């Protein structure tokens, strides 16, 4: 009876979780070439809003709010990222960097077409610089 139960458990094991969870940290290079100056203003305008937060992208639009994040406006995007998804000064262990840099993984963000290398670089360098707030925001860095 025990062998039958064990066989059934082993056979069902692969049916549980079909995707691995993202790692806590990955290796990233901060000596890459960003497409633009790695400020949050640029990151939001040139990558996040257009790629993840537009009505066409839907995932992190005002309506989509996937993962509880809206990139519909700069303040919401900054608040969402700095509420545990970014470790200022530590891009290797920042959830947003892990997910955007894990090309081909089930947890890659955005799903489908990844961010371009220069966009990922700008994100990595912004986090490395301490994830400073947008230029018009009060309160400075997180």
Named regions from a protein language model:
Residues 17-142:
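Aromatic- and Gly/Pro-enriched helix-to-coil junctions and flexible linker segments
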Residues 1-17:
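Sec-dependent bacterial lipoprotein signal peptides
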């Amino acid at each position: 009876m025990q062998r039958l139960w064990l066989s059934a458990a082993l056979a069902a094991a692969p049916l549980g979780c079909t995707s691995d969870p993202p790692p806590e940290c990955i290796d990233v290079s901060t000596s890459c070439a960003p497409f633009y100056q790695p400020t949050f203003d640029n990151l939001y305008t040139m990558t996040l809003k257009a790629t993840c937060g537009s009505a066409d992208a839907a995932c992190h639009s005002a309506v989509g709010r996937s993962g509880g994040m809206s990139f519909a406006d700069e303040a919401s995007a900054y608040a969402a990222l700095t509420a545990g998804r970014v470790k200022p000064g530590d891009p290797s262990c920042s959830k947003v960097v892990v997910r955007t840099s894990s090309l081909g993984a089930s947890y890659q963000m955005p799903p489908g077409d990844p961010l371009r290398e220069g966009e990922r670089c700008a994100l990595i360098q912004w986090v490395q610089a301490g994830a400073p707030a947008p230029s018009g925001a009060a309160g400075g860095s997180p």
